[in-house]
Amino acid sequence: MSEYRRYYIKGGTWFFTVNLRNRRSQLLTTQYQMLRHAIIKVKRDRPFEINAWVVLPEHMHCIWTLPEGDDDFSSRWREIKKQFTHACGLKNIWQPRFWEHAIRNTKDYRHHVDYIYINPVKHGWVKQVSDWPFSTFHRDVARGLYPIDWAGDVTDFSAGERIIS
């Protein structure tokens, strides 16, 4: 069995998928404010830019850009997981790792942001992207980056974490 090695780029932009251990849980959305508080605290102590984020009941996808000269996303994730777990008064709720993908170019970035925003529709939680409250989609609509009806009623969106090129 090969040993997994993470790829680090100082100041890089990354797509992440982070899962709860119990894939039937709804903890991330029922305790969304606790999760949000954990993210804000870690971001205040160890800054990073949130490019896009969606929180689903048992997993989340996001894109971060780290500060110039900084490649340590792992300790930020460790701290977010720790803060949230402690706030919920639970133990052992996360899958041990997370999945990351270094964003390579503008096309790759756009593809992953679209994937993040369509994810609640893909999983059947809502019919339209704008109906999902746990997403930076609404921020990006306010900024004029997406129309409010973007991807409305899309039922088959072909995208994912892994892109082979």
From Swiss-Prot:
Domain of life: Bacteria
Regulation: Cleavage occurs in the presence of magnesium, but is much more pronounced with manganese.
SUPFAM superfamilies with a match to the protein in the record: Transposase IS200-like
A Gene Ontology molecular function term of the record: transposase activity
Coiled-coil stretches: none
Record keywords: DNA-binding, Manganese, Transposable element, Transposition
InterPro entries: RAYT_transposase (IPR052715), Transposase_17 (IPR002686), Transposase_17_sf (IPR036515)
Family recorded in the similarity comment: Belongs to the transposase 17 family. RAYT subfamily.
Complex and partners: Monomer.
This protein's name: REP-associated tyrosine transposase
Organism placement in taxonomy: Bacteria, Pseudomonadati, Pseudomonadota, Gammaproteobacteria, Enterobacterales
Gene name linked to the record: rayT
